[in-house]
């Protein structure tokens, strides 16, 4: 059964630095500054937790960014692992903390569209039209980078992905830091993306300097990525903004092959989520597509002993005694987007040998949900 996990309980603390005591926010009562030796590449650090978006907390979080630290940031899509996008050393720490391949580019986050000209060359009118309609929101635009944006941030590309997140805490931190924040999803590379602070604690506690709890993510899947450097524009990753909404502004949009399959070895990804296996729980996943009734019956008939199920609400009763995670009603793709990563991640805490998942059709937000499930499965898909 799907359950929304609450944020960890928080208690006020004082943080000691350079012999001084100063209030920085809140810290989970059960996670008080654990020192964890994570790896030889990334030394253990004390993680400070912020909860209330006070002026003091925003400034303290911004200082972490300015000083080259790593900060978990809330957005409407998923939680991000943020650093100063212009600081190559800080950006390198993102890759090390996540275990992320360095040819996998990062998205930079800005507080509004006026920042586009700071970091992008030859910004086309279409970019401003999209920003006017969809920013702040779950849309990333690929544009030519200015030299101020390091190649380390862009994965070696001459383009950069830019978005304005629809979360007041993160926009306030960006504005206070006065630098763009490079932020991939805050999970360990390859795992399901974090949609609440508990997920961030699970993956990054003791690896990064700060985490800002902004509550559960309203959208639940990453941003849609559109490449505006080609004609027609190209969808590189489906996400929280449906393809149909983009085409209402831009006209026809091509869909990159990476949306429906993995890139081959040697092919360079132009955006996050294109090349590598992503979003995967520990147990192998099989995705079953087709009519919801037919796919549910197929899983019921073929489900191995010890396997778990991700299914639509209407079909939970077909799997008594099984480990089940409810993806939401078959017709409610927005709810499926909010639940998909939680369902995948929760199976890591259960004794399942493999996972069978129902999958929505690709209309609207269904394209993003389908993409995340299929990537979690390494595109191991059964059509019924």
What are the functions of these language-model segments?
Residues 33-34, 38-384:
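Active-site-adjacent structural elements in enzyme catalytic cores
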Residues 4-7, 48:
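Absolute N-terminal positional cue centered near the fourth residue
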Residues 2, 26, 35-38:
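Intrinsic-disorder-associated, low-complexity terminal segments enriched in Asp/Asn/His/Tyr and depleted
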Residues 7, 29, 37-39:
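Serine residues within intrinsically disordered or low-complexity segments
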